[in-house]
Each structure stands twice: as C-alpha cells, then as structure tokens.
Amino acid sequence: MTGPLTAPGLTGMADAVLHEVASLAARHGETGDTAAIELTSIPLTRLDREDIVIRLGRGEVEATIDSAGRSEVWETSYAGVWLVRHLGLDGKVATETIEICAAPLILFSHPDDRRAAAARLGEDLRAKAAPAA
C-alpha cells in the first residue's frame, strides 16, 4: 500500500476506511466471511475517495459491465479486496463499494441467464448439425 496523501481536503477518513478493510480482509482470510463497505454512504471528500483508491492500487483482474449504466470492477493490489463502481447514465459515480470476497457477485451470471444460454447453445448446435434442405 502506498503512503497516505497529505493535502487539504483529506479528513483522515481514508485511514479509518483502510483499517476497516484490513480487518475485514483478515477475517475473510480466516473464515471466508464476505463484507462490503459502501463508500458513497460515508462522509468522504473527493480526495478521501481518491486516496483510498490510490492506496489500494490495482491488481491483475478488472471487468466492465454495460447494463443499465456502466459498472467498473477491479481487484485491488490486495487479493480478495475489490472496488466496484457503478456509474449512472450520466457517467457520474452512483455508488462505489469496496467488496471483500473471492469475486463480487456482479461478475456472476444469474442462474436463469445461464439456463437460457445453455438452451440457446444447444439449439444453435442442433441447427448447425441439421442437414441443409
């Protein structure tokens, strides 16, 4: 983790949030319990949020989801600590969450979608295998 920013506009809340992340990550490693910290519900300044994001860094995994707005997901430089950012249709941050888990649920397809996709794939394969008329 890089050091904290020192600038006007920082309230010290970034340190408190990061200590909570460290505690939750340790618990996740021991018990598998998952947790989330909704950053947009905490009285953070813009600089506080930037400080948190910078200090957590970026890891090797990231994804973008385009569904009812855009969502950006990335694992931080700490395995199991993810940042999930949902943007409104105007492109502004609607919610920003730190999730402590193996992978955020937003990355998992819904069971109904998986069943429909399996059926569609089977139909596509049967149609391709059918002799041309």
Regions found by a protein language model. Give the residues of each.
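Extended alpha-helical surfaces
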Residues: A22-A35, E62, A68-G69, H86-A94, ...
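Helix-rich interaction surfaces within compact, conserved domain-sized segments
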Residues: W74-A133
